[in-house]
């Protein structure tokens, strides 16, 4: 097991070509939000764009579309009820933040994992669907990223006594299923089974609602930009934590909001680039 250090991250992070255009940086697809829970979609979308995706489409319920259009005009919008789910024309997919777990959500989840041939991240309510529809696990494409917090992890894989037990299970499941697991926590684990990293950035300010939604957006953005899924997960977790550390210069861990973290992502990228010179 390795530490996710700044020096290592600098070896895998690619600075942007000054002459590039939006088409060079991928088209991310996020499926997020539901009635009364659109904050998760807004947070994931903002984080995705701040992490560098060239284009972003967010699939939301029709009645909630105005929330996203006002909050993040840079994102394109698709309506959940009429979207054709021709998903493989996108560069990467992140799904689950506050989507709900009703029959319609299960239908969408099943449709996506059955047809997906592009990088995929499963989070939040999509993980909760998976925990109650275990037969769907075998349909998950190889290389898919799962991003559970400890309670979601236990719902998926059974109760564990402590973090060490969860880490052991995560490593074994990742290897067995050929997937990537990001086990979120104080020291987040990123594992492909064959190789595992412990994150070295972040602080207690991330211990509040919206943090996981932002991480979903960030990792999905990196996948859309062409990073291999395991690399995207490493970059996403590290940048997410580094931005929180930078935000802590202006906020306390008690007062920090995930919007403070997202607004600190530019400084996080600059820190990586400046320190690598």
Task: Give the location of each predicted region.
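Small-residue (G/A/S/T)-rich helix-start motifs and N-terminal tracts that mark the onset
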Residues: 1-119, 128-143, 150, 154-277
């Amino acid at each position: 097991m390795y530490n996710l250090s700044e020096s290592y991250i600098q070896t895998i992070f690619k600075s942007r070509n000054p002459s590039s255009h939006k088409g060079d940086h991928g088209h991310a697809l996020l499926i997020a939000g539901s009635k009364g829970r659109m904050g998760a979609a807004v947070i994931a979308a903002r984080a995705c764009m701040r992490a560098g995706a060239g284009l972003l489409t967010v699939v939301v319920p029709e009645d909630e579309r105005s929330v996203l259009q006002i909050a993040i005009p840079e994102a394109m919008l698709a309506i959940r009820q009429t979207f054709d789910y021709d998903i493989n024309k996108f560069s990467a997919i992140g799904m689950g933040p506050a989507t709900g777990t009703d029959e319609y959500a299960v239908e969408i989840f099943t449709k996506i994992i059955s047809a997906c041939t592009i990088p995929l991240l499963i989070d939040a309510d999509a993980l909760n669907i998976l925990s109650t529809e275990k037969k769907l696990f075998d349909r998950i494409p190889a290389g898919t990223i799962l991003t559970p917090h400890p309670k979601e992890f236990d719902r998926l894989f059974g109760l564990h006594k402590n973090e060490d037990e969860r880490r052991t299970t995560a490593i074994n499941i990742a290897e067995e299923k050929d997937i990537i697991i990001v086990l979120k926590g104080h020291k987040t684990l990123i594992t492909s089974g064959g190789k595992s990293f412990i994150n070295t950035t972040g602080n207690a300010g991330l211990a509040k609602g919206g943090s996981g939604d932002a991480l979903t957006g960030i990792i999905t953005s990196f996948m859309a930009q062409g990073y291999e899924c395991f690399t995207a997960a490493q970059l996403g977790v590290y940048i997410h934590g580094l931005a929180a550390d930078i935000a802590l210069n202006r906020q306390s861990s008690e007062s920090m909001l995930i919007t403070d973290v997202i607004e600190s992502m530019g400084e996080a990228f600059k820190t990586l680039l400046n320190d690598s010179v």
